[in-house]
Structures are given as structure tokens and as C-alpha cells.
Curated annotation (Swiss-Prot):
Keyword presence, Glycoprotein: no
GO biological process: glycine decarboxylation via glycine cleavage system
The family this protein is said to belong to: Belongs to the GcvT family.
Annotated EC: 2.1.2.10
Subunit description: The glycine cleavage system is composed of four proteins: P, T, L and H.
Pfam family of the protein (one): GCV_T
Entries under NCBIfam families matching the protein: gcvT (TIGR00528), PRK00389.1 (NF001567)
PANTHER family xrefs: AMINOMETHYLTRANSFERASE, AMINOMETHYLTRANSFERASE, MITOCHONDRIAL
Known catalytic reactions: N(6)-[(R)-S(8)-aminomethyldihydrolipoyl]-L-lysyl-[protein] + (6S)-5,6,7,8-tetrahydrofolate = N(6)-[(R)-dihydrolipoyl]-L-lysyl-[protein] + (6R)-5,10-methylene-5,6,7,8-tetrahydrofolate + NH4(+)
HAMAP family hit by this protein: GcvT
One cellular component term from this protein's GO annotations in UniProt: cytosol
Domain of life per record: Bacteria
Protein name listed in UniProt: Aminomethyltransferase
Length: 369
């Protein structure tokens, strides 16, 4: 199967990116090296090409009410210029995908129309787009691809906001987390959508730009000493922050309560949404398993699917695992029975035929200062 390439593919290659297949795309797994890139984001600033992600615009007279029928999070808690994290559900209460919803407010006053921007995972983008369109188009909403041939960048790390402030002259420290605005950046042809969001556990912004503006900004930031980063560092950074990866830490057979995302489920709101009845039953009974954080003794790495052991028997399975460059420890996420999900619980992980000791710990493993 032919792999998609982002508009930054050639620049990633010339910058030293080692390209690998990922979710139907050819993406850089690393540039200078995973640990160097990871450390740059934790201590300074790193730049990611995330143009493989899906970006949809939902537009009409009531986009928030319409999308509310698909997500369990009360979208009316956010207003124009704000955003929230949520999940799409199936009728069984399982997670179809996770997403971020950005409220653009009224975008066509003559028609009384408002708009939302929705960012979805690359691996789910085609299915999500088809399903969302199928559900919302009959309600009079227009669902379109907002990204087109544009570019999505993530600038992350303690210096990220200062870098953008130098280019925009805007105090981005005054922009709340999960807020967004349009920015005029020096040397670019049109305003840039800028959100104070990210997937690294650090402060930073995510930017949606026109193709040539995105290429221009990538070159300028890299020339100015910003470290280009690949999927490898993105994965270790998000794991230290205990941020979920769809398809590994949650899937269509996982409820938000099992995944530790019960805070996204607002059953107190009157709205009916896909999967509500199943989640009401799940809330009453409580989950039989939970996603936990593990720290392992020793340097062996727990990989996806490795058995979690208790009293000599398999009790669960690893979903994500890695060596933590920041903590200098082996860390992992795993599903275990609720009775074993207590902080301090001693467990084991079977790695290449040997059981390595592990302890349930609080998540996230790392929280930025």
C-alpha cells in the first residue's frame, strides 16, 4: 500500500529524519536521536510535524448541540476561543477515538452559523470523518476537511511560548491552557490557528498553517535552533505524561471508566449521546479492570501485550511501555483487575520468559514544573 506523505516530508528528510510507516503515513521516527529529542522538549523546545492528524470543521446553526450527540463530555462548558478533550463512543460505550474540540464561535453572522474544529487521530481519520458526517449531515451540519494540503505543527517545551511570542508580538502566556486564537506571524502570508495544547506533557502550542507558510515556519524554527523531533520522542514524552495512545491504551472495547477517563463522562447533563445507556450501566456496576501506571525494577522494557503477573498467573496486559529518559526508569501502562489497581500493589511483568517485578504508581509518571 502506498503511504501518504505530509507537505513537510522532503524537509524532514533533508533535516535528517529517519522515515518509517505509521498509520498509513511515512513519518520521521527520529532526527538527531530519541533521547536527545526527548530531552530537548523537556528542557528547551522541540518541533513536531503532526500533519498526519485529521482536522475537521463542523459548521452550521448548532454544531455544538449536534456534536454533543456523539461525545459524553458537556461541550457547553466551553465557549468561543476554548477547547476540550473528549472521546467518540460506540453504542457499547467503547472508545472509537479520542479528539480535541475547538469552539470557533460564530463564523457567519449573516447565516447565524457557528463552527467547531475537531482534531482526530491519523489511524482513525477516514472512519471518523465518514461516521461524523453520516451522523451530523442529516442534522443540517456541514462537515469538511479543514486541513486540506495544509500543515499541522506542534511546538513543545518550556521555551515554546517565548519562541512564538518573538514571531507574533503576542503575550501567549496570557492564553489559558486549551485556549486558542488566530496569530499573525512575521513573514507568513496569512493568520495561523494557534492552540495552547499538546501531547508531550509540556507547555506549548499546536499550529494549523497553509502549506507554504508551514514549510516557511519549519525552516525558520529549525534554522533558529529548535530541535526537530520524531514519533519516537513523541511516544516517550506522552507516556511519561501518561497520555493515552489510541489503539494501544484504549480501543473500541474499552470504556472511559476502564481507561481512567471517567472525568470525560458527564452523565449529569440531559443530552442523549451515543453509548450513554451503556455508560450509565457501567457507572452503576463499576469497571472490572482499570488502566494503571507501572514502574519496573531493572532496565528491562515492558512492551505492548506483555503479560502482567500476579500470584504466578496472568492478571492483565501491558498496553504501552518504555524506558523513561527523564526518570531513568522503566515505565508502562497496563490493564489489571480493579482489585489490583491500588497504588503500591506489587505485580510482575513477563519479559522474554522472565518475570520482572513492578509496582503500581500514581499517574502521570512525570508532571512538568
Amino acid at each position: 500500500m502506498d503511504l501518504h506523505r505530509t507537505p513537510l516530508h522532503d524537509l524532514c528528510v533533508t533535516t535528517g529524519g529517519r522515515m518509517v510507516p505509521f498509520a498509513g503515513w511515512e513519518m520521521p521516527v527520529q532526527f538527531s536521536g530519541l533521547v536527545a529529542e526527548h530531552t530537548a522538549v523537556r528542557q528547551r523546545v522541540g518541533l513536531f510535524d503532526i500533519s498526519h492528524m485529521g482536522v475537521l470543521r463542523i459548521e452550521g446553526s448548532n454544531p455544538k448541540d449536534a456534536l454533543q450527540t456523539l461525545v459524553p463530555t458537556d461541550l457547553h462548558r466551553i465557549g468561543p476561543g476554548q477547547a476540550c478533550y473528549s472521546v467518540l463512543l460506540n453504542e457499547s460505550g467503547g472508545i472509537r477515538d479520542d479528539l480535541i474540540v475547538y469552539d470557533l464561535g460564530q463564523t457567519n453572522s449573516d447565516q447565524g452559523e457557528a463552527s467547531l474544529i475537531v482534531v482526530i487521530n491519523a489511524a482513525c481519520a477516514a472512519a471518523d470523518t465518514a461516521w461524523i458526517s453520516e451522523q451530523l449531515t442529516p442534522q443540517g451540519l456541514k462537515v469538511t476537511d479543514e486541513k486540506g494540503d495544509g500543515i499541522l505543527l506542534a511546538l513543545q517545551g518550556p521555551e515554546a511560548l517565548a519562541r512564538m511570542e518573538q514571531l507574533s508580538g503576542v503575550d501567549l502566556h496570557a492564553l489559558p491552557r486549551f485556549a486558542h486564537r488566530m496569530l499573525d506571524l512575521t513573514g507568513l502570508s496569512r493568520p495561523v490557528f494557534c492552540a495552547r495544547t499538546g501531547y508531550t506533557g509540556e507547555d506549548g502550542v499546536e499550529l494549523l498553517l497553509a502549506r507554504e507558510d508551514g514549510r516557511n515556519l519549519w525552516n525558520r524554527l529549525v534554522a533558529d535552533g529548535v530541535t526537530p523531533c520524531g514519533l519516537g520522542a513523541r511516544d516517550t514524552l506522552r507516556l511519561e505524561a501518561a497520555m493515552h495512545l489510541y489503539g494501544q491504551d484504549m480501543d473500541a472495547d474499552t470504556t472511559p471508566f476502564e481507561a481512567g477517563l471517567g472525568w470525560l463522562v458527564h452523565l449529569e447533563m440531559p443530552s442523549t449521546f451515543t453509548g450513554r445507556a451503556a455508560l450509565e450501566r457501567a457507572a452503576d456496576s463499576g469497571p472490572s479492570r482499570r488502566l494503571v501506571g507501572l514502574k519496573l525494577k531493572g532496565r528491562a522494557i515492558a512492551r505492548h501485550g506483555y503479560p502482567v503477573i500476579h500470584n504466578g498467573e496472568q492478571a492483565g496486559a501491558i498496553t504501552s511501555g518504555s524506558w523513561s529518559p527523564t526518570l531513568q526508569e522503566a515505565i508502562a501502562l497496563a490493564y489489571v483487575p480493579t482489585a489490583l489497581a491500588k497504588v503500591g500493589q506489587e505485580l510482575g511483568v513477563e519479559i522474554r520468559g522472565q518475570v520482572q517485578a513492578a509496582t503500581v504508581v500514581r499517574r502521570p509518571f512525570y508532571r512538568h514544573p
